[in-house]
Amino acid sequence: SAASDVYKRQDGYVIVSVAWVTFSLFGMLPYYIGGYIPSVTDAFFETMSGFSSTGATILNNIESMPHGILFWRAMTQWIGGLGIVFFTIAVLPIFGVGGIQVFAAEASGPTHDKVHPRIGITAKWIWGIYAGMTGTLIVLLVFGGMSVFDSICHAFTTTSTGGFSTKQASIEYYHSPYICLLYTSPS
């Protein structure tokens, strides 16, 4: 019935909202417990910015952070690029809420047509493409002179369109026309 569909869609919105807050509360722990971001609100903001691929940051001396924190920061954006949506789609059926309701809560625009008859298969295809794009960019950045660590972090944040960097000056730090071309060339 129509009322049942609205109720399920509302459930999807609530579950997505709770998932974002929950992931961010747990995701802020490395920053806060490690003392790298001593304010709870700042640590939460940095994490929410990562998981939402927003790219806003409260950090003003990025290069002073240890590699583990920089990797976690990049990973939050990579996970946020697609991960939370598809994790939720894969896990929610266990709790009796279908993945389509959650997809509708996250998707913009009309959602009358299904992406694929089986959302799980679609999610696997999208994850494969996402991982492939990330891997390709890692190789291209290493080829351009970035360290493996910086290449991984930048590929994570670029693929997700979040834009966090391991350097205060972002890609300008490298003074590389090749790297700039990778970031500015049309797809």
Predicted feature residues:
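Transmembrane alpha-helical segments in integral membrane proteins
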Residues: 76-98, 185
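P-loop potassium selectivity filter motif centered on the GYG triad
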Residues: 26-80, 143-185
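Juxtamembrane inter-helical linkers in multi-pass membrane proteins
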Residues: 98-119, 155-165
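Membrane-helix interfacial "entry" motifs
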Residues: 8, 12, 66-73, 110-122, ...
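Long, contiguous internal "core" modules enriched in hydrophobic/ aromatic residues
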Residues: 117-150, 156
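Hydrophobic core segments of alpha-helical transmembrane domains in multi-pass membrane transport
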Residues: 1, 24-28, 88-91, 133-142, ...
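Conserved small/polar residues in nucleotide/adenosyl-binding loops
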Residues: 2-10, 183-187
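Alpha-helical transmembrane segments and their helix-start/interface "positive-inside/aromatic belt" motifs
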Residues: 8-21, 120-132
